[in-house]
């Protein structure tokens, strides 16, 4: 039996810049969603989703009902801050899924990705837990949002490492004024500093588009699904395969293609799910 899957990414996408990271609405996660079902259930899902879209047709923009219909300020406190109309919309949306649905979600920290790239040549050892080192750096950046460190992140890996070392040194000094609460953090930061003083810094960084598809391939294997198609929301120049599609193929996925969401309800469903 063949299965039909549809892919979309959050509008946050892979964008990481100084204004987004220091902004109040910054979200560190890159999200991707792939939804699907057996091909013989396609018509039933399409009918349900079209009925959902027609119910909320007054919210459509350019002919599509998009996840952006729910504004960020409605989600400041999660479901608690949603108005009744949006609670109803979300409930109706999830009602379009049933026990025949397959849902795969992928989430990655954008800053963590950059840190992993810088330390990709380092592994755990009896002397250092590199996973803990990476975690400590990501947590420090996301928690304190040091402008000088974040700004350097978009210049070069070498400048980023230098700025991070300065920040950690200053943070350790400040923490010594309250060691009762900050002793554990200082221990972690001192370990990170030791690594940074000896790290072989790469010349440049580039986003890897493969991770979400490697995970999805494992998802398919776990479900015993061999015959399938994956349709990806088209991005970039017409007639040119996007990096997303190329990465899906390079990750081992078969029968992949991309298309405009306005022509495929499954892509629109994935968009509503991933936000």
Regions found by a protein language model. Name each.
Residues 1-275:
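Phosphate-ester processing/binding pockets and catalytic centers
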């Amino acid at each position: 039996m063949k299965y039909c899957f549809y892919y979309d990414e959050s509008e946050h996408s892979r964008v990481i810049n100084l204004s987004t990271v220091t902004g109040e609405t910054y979200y560190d996660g890159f999200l991707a969603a792939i939804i699907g079902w057996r091909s013989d259930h396609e018509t039933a899902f399409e009918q349900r989703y079209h009925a959902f879209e027609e119910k909320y047709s007054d919210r459509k923009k350019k002919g599509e009902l998009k996840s952006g219909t729910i504004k960020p300020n409605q989600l400041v406190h999660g479901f608690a801050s949603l108005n009744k109309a949006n609670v109803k919309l979300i409930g109706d949306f999830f009602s379009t899924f049933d026990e025949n649905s397959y849902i795969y979600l992928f989430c990655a920290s954008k800053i963590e990705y950059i840190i992993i790239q810088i330390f990709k040549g380092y592994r755990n050892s009896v002397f250092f837990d590199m996973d803990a080192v990476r975690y400590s750096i990501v947590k420090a950046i996301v928690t304190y949002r040091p402008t000088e460190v974040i700004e350097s992140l978009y210049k070069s890996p070498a400048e980023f490492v230098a700025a991070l070392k300065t920040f950690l040194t200053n943070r350790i000094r400040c923490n010594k004024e309250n060691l009762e609460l900050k002793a554990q953090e200082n221990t972690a930061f001192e370990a990170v500093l030791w690594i940074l003083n000896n790290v072989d810094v790469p010349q440049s960084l580039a986003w890897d588009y493969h991770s979400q598809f490697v995970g999805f391939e494992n998802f398919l294997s776990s479900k015993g699904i061999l015959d399938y198609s994956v349709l990806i929301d088209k991005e970039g120049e017409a007639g040119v395969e996007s990096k997303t599609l190329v990465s899906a193929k390079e990750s081992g996925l078969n029968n992949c293609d991309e298309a405009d969401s306005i022509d495929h309800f499954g892509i629109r469903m994935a968009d509503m799910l991933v936000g």
